[in-house]
């Protein structure tokens, strides 16, 4: 086999590979003879079909099957011999004639080689959130609202009321698609509608009609409506007032708590602290990763981005439970490209840093992280034992330990400031971020 390496710009290069004719023809001949012994053909007994007839009728097909098997073997050997780190590959067949060498080009996309420097340029705003009894009481109040019962009342609309409404949304005086609905239930203050919509209903009475003006958010999914000033003609058809359950032993049992109200409040606080810790870690880590992407200079392999896009589509399909009749491949790659590119770039940067630094996940550190994570489950010890039996889960934990160490290492060199934030705003932002990332 003859291999010619043609270097191209950046992370691209090509291998021109030539396989001797006798090697190809020999394999094809053997496959034709093997086929002749098993194929059924009119006029011949099984195993007695002449190889010449098989070649005449199926020779081209057999040759292509042989080549399809042989090409990956040859370019894999060439890649190994040339010590190339390949991210993606496309094969272009050049010459394929009996009695002549097989020639093909393997167009390669390589993993970029780069070194990350300038960590001091990274700016991180570290959120500081105080979790007090006030936030715990508010969380319990939110849980009470989840179990609220509603009864119709004759009064003006107030916060926390459930209202049944009709509405027609208009942009530039014309009704826009998706902006009209009838008999929609809205809980005032829940945030289920765009900002300003629910506030505009406060003070209305049953049977009242009103036109409000609201501006759609900048990041609204429908780009035609993003930042657009619109009007909504609203009719209130029913007003219901919420009645919240008392916080007593019966109420806390709905959450699987057996130790009474005091135990319930303690568990709520512990859960809030645990969730807050992981969210704040994530917020800091996201800023660190964003900063790393800004200072690192390299070309991102498109094949890796495409692979990540395909994985995101399959993950979406899985989240939808396989959704019958839904073809995820009909979704445009553009919907996933930005997130996919970020993930690929972050992964390449972290790998580059880890290759130059010696970060290790000690067994005790993995155990400690596991202990912390399983506290969110009803049966922590049982969950812990199940995870410890799963090699993939343990590998993920080790990777997370190393990722945390790397993040701390970058933070030691970065510009870090602190900013006080509200607990519930942090939770809300986290939910929005998760939804934006599918």
Curated annotation (Swiss-Prot):
Any one GO CC term of the record: cytoplasm
Keyword terms, alphabetized: Cell cycle, Cell division, Chaperone, Cytoplasm, Isomerase, Rotamase
Reaction(s) this enzyme catalyzes, per UniProt: [protein]-peptidylproline (omega=180) = [protein]-peptidylproline (omega=0)
Described function: Involved in protein export. Acts as a chaperone by maintaining the newly synthesized protein in an open conformation. Functions as a peptidyl-prolyl cis-trans isomerase.
Single GO MF descriptor: ribosome binding
Pfam family, one: Trigger_C
Protein known as: Trigger factor
Designated gene of the protein: tig
Its EC number(s): 5.2.1.8
């Amino acid at each position: 086999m003859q291999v010619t390496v043609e270097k191209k710009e950046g992370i691209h290069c090509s291998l021109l590979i030539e396989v001797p004719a006798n090697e190809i023809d020999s394999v094809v001949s053997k496959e034709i003879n093997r086929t002749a012994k098993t194929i059924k053909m009119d006029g011949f007994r099984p195993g007695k079909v002449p190889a010449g007839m098989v070649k005449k009728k199926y020779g081209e097909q057999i040759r292509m099957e042989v080549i399809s098997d042989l090409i990956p073997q040859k370019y894999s050997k060439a890649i190994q011999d040339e010590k190339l780190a390949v991210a993606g590959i496309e094969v272009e067949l050049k010459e394929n004639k009996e009695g002549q060498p097989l020639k093909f080009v393997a167009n390669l996309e390589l993993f970029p080689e780069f070194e990350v420097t300038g960590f001091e340029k990274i700016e991180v705003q570290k959120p500081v959130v105080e979790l007090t009894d006030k936030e715990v009481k508010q969380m319990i109040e939110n849980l009470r609202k989840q179990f609220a019962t509603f009864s119709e009342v004759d009064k003006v609309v107030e916060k926390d009321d459930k209202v049944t409404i009709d509405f027609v949304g208009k942009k530039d005086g014309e009704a826009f698609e998706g902006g009209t609905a009838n008999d929609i239930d809205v809980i005032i203050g829940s945030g289920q509608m765009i900002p300003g919509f629910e506030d505009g209903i406060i003070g209305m009475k049953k049977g009242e009609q009103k036109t409000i003006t609201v501006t759609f958010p900048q990041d609204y999914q429908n780009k035609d409506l993003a930042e657009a000033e619109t009007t909504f003609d609203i009719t209130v058809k029913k007003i219901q007032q919420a009645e919240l359950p008392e916080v007593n032993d019966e109420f806390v049992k709905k959450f699987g708590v057996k130790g009474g109200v005091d135990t319930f409040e303690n568990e709520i606080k512990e859960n809030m602290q645990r969730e807050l810790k992981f969210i704040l870690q994530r917020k800091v880590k996201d800023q660190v990763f964003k900063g790393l992407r800004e200072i690192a200079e390299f070309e991102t392999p498109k094949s890796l981005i495409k692979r990540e896009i395909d994985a995101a589509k399959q993950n979406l399909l899985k989240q939808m439970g396989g959704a019958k009749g839904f073809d995820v491949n009909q979704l445009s790659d553009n919907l996933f490209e930005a997130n996919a590119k970020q993930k690929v770039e972050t992964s390449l940067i972290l790998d580059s840093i880890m290759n130059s630094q010696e970060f290790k996940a000690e067994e005790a550190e993995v155990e400690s992280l596991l202990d912390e994570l399983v506290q969110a489950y009803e049966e922590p010890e049982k969950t812990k034992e199940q995870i410890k039996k799963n090699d993939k889960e343990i590998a993920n934990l080790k990777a997370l330990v190393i990722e945390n160490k790397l993040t701390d290492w970058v933070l030691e060199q970065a510009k870090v400031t602190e900013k006080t934030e509200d607990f519930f705003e942090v939770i809300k932002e986290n939910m929005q971020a998760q939804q934006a990332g599918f």
